[in-house]
Amino acid sequence: MFWSKKPLDLPTPETALKGRPDAIPTARLHHVNQNPLKGPYPDGFRTAIFALGCFWGAERAFWRTPGVWVTAVGYLAGLTPNPTYEEVCSGRTGHTEGVLVVYDPAVISYADLVKLFFESHDPTQGMRQGNDVGTQYRSGIYTSDPQEKAVAEAVKASYEAALKAKGFGPITTEIIDGGPFYFAEDYHQQYLSKNPGGYCGLGGTGVSCPIGVGVAAQ
């Protein structure tokens, strides 16, 4: 079901859709590289999760990056268990459209992924990204430990200063533990590989994101 006007405030536990106990069916293998979306992942590899607007274009930005082993799109940082795409788009689940990134830290650092994240979209737009408006398009970095959070906060501070110098407003990116990651439907996985001419609303600010020496290798 779609609502004619999307709310721009997050739902409460009382107003959120109830969801379902079972996971939504999705693809088993990555459409581009045939690696397993849900694992097992190689020993020593790490995961990162980002939200930067419509996940179709966001996922492609990461799977094209050297050192990234597999990507998947899904929903997180919300309230409704096992939501569908239609439910997320209603604004009544509280989720973002996120990208799970599995990467080799010997090839690319977490800080470099955060840099790519910031440069790939406009993180100052609140509950929208370009023409895409709604709570599911908000910017987010979903960290799994204190070290990731510290790196994300440090890179955010550096980029916020760079953006301010170019006339942009404050960064609205949330940096939190996003809770469960619910894999999106098969149709959405690697969408722009399956549909090369498909919609991609991803667009950055044109401002380079600096990384301090202290966090560059993390």
UniProtKB/Swiss-Prot annotation:
Catalytic activity: L-methionyl-[protein] + [thioredoxin]-disulfide + H2O = L-methionyl-(S)-S-oxide-[protein] + [thioredoxin]-dithiol; [thioredoxin]-disulfide + L-methionine + H2O = L-methionine (S)-S-oxide + [thioredoxin]-dithiol
UniProt keyword annotation of Electron transport present: no
Gene3D superfamilies: Peptide methionine sulphoxide reductase MsrA (3.30.1060.10)
A Pfam family that the UniProt record links to this protein: PMSR
One Gene Ontology CC term in the entry: cytoplasm
GO MF annotation list: L-methionine-(S)-S-oxide reductase activity; peptide-methionine (S)-S-oxide reductase activity
GO BP, one annotated term: protein modification process
Keywords, ordered alphabetically: Oxidoreductase
Active site positions: 54
Enzyme class: oxidoreductase
EC number(s) per entry: 1.8.4.11
PANTHER family, sorted: MITOCHONDRIAL PEPTIDE METHIONINE SULFOXIDE REDUCTASE (PTHR42799:SF2)
UniProt function note: Has an important function as a repair enzyme for proteins that have been inactivated by oxidation. Catalyzes the reversible oxidation-reduction of methionine sulfoxide in proteins to methionine.
Family note: Belongs to the MsrA Met sulfoxide reductase family.
Protein name: Peptide methionine sulfoxide reductase MsrA
